[in-house]
Amino acid sequence: MNSPTKVPVTILTGFLGSGKTTLLNRILSEEHGKRIAVIENEYGEVGIDQALVINADEEIFEMSNGCICCTVRGDLIRVLGNLMKRRDKFDYILLETTGLADPGPVAQTFFMDDEIASEFSLDGIVTLVDAHHINQQLGRSQESTEQIAFADVILLNKTDLVKAEELDALETRLREMNRLARVHRCERANVAISTVLNLEAFNLEQVLADHPTFLEPEYPFEWTGVYALSPGSYELSLDDGPDPTMSLAMLERL
């Protein structure tokens, strides 16, 4: 059960093109009467609908239906701290990850920092899955596998693009990958807001049973955010060489 003194947080994840931003825009445009703060990653494939924005001059801005939205331009912990200065304007946080992100380190944030842990409660992780492309994505991306493995709720989206028998086989595969997640089928990310919020689904004990190293740093350095670099050439230097567990793909993204 969520603590009445903490702000509940849902992490919204899913591979590129799965429908995360479509769902966010739906939530931000509906008159649902809820006061939701949306944390949108600046490097998402598609931004929020600017027609819904009242004032976007600052990092945190208000939407036309009373929700507020902010963009991660650096350290997530700093953004959460700034958001808490407007605590009287929201009751819930919806946090979108990038399509290429493993949600595990994002979820870690709410347990590894004492101040964050005292103010926020991780309510659940919702993963959107593109029914039309997920089989190919699972074959070439570890991140898409982790997004499904960490999910408390899986939204099997774009079901109108897949034949019924293929859809049944896909849902069976997803349930084999994550035996505890609730699976909902949808088109155009059209789901009830109750499917995403107030889940009371994240279970730290269960996560530690499935991922024993969840509360341990994944790499020997702290993640401080994502930063944009101007075009040009850069040299990356790592003390003692790269960690042997880091893949070439990870180094290329760095």
Over which residues does each language-model region extend?
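Short, ordered loop/turn segments at secondary-structure junctions
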Residues: N41-Y43, T159, R188
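Alpha-helix boundary/capping detector
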Residues: V53, V106-T109, H132-H133, A151, ...
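Non-catalytic interfacial helical region
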Residues: P105-E115, A131-S144, I148, I154-L156, ...
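C-terminal accessory "lid"/substrate-recognition subdomains
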Residues: E146, V153, V162-L254
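Short conserved AdoMet
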Residues: H32, D88, A149, N178-R179
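Short, glycine- and charge-enriched coil/turn segments that flank and shape catalytic ligand pockets
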Residues: M1-N2, E165
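Nucleotide-state-sensitive switch-loop elements of NTP-binding domains
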Residues: N2-Q142
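Short, surface-exposed, polar/charged, turn-prone segments marking secondary-structure boundaries
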Residues: N65-I68, F90-D91, T98-G99, F120-G124, ...
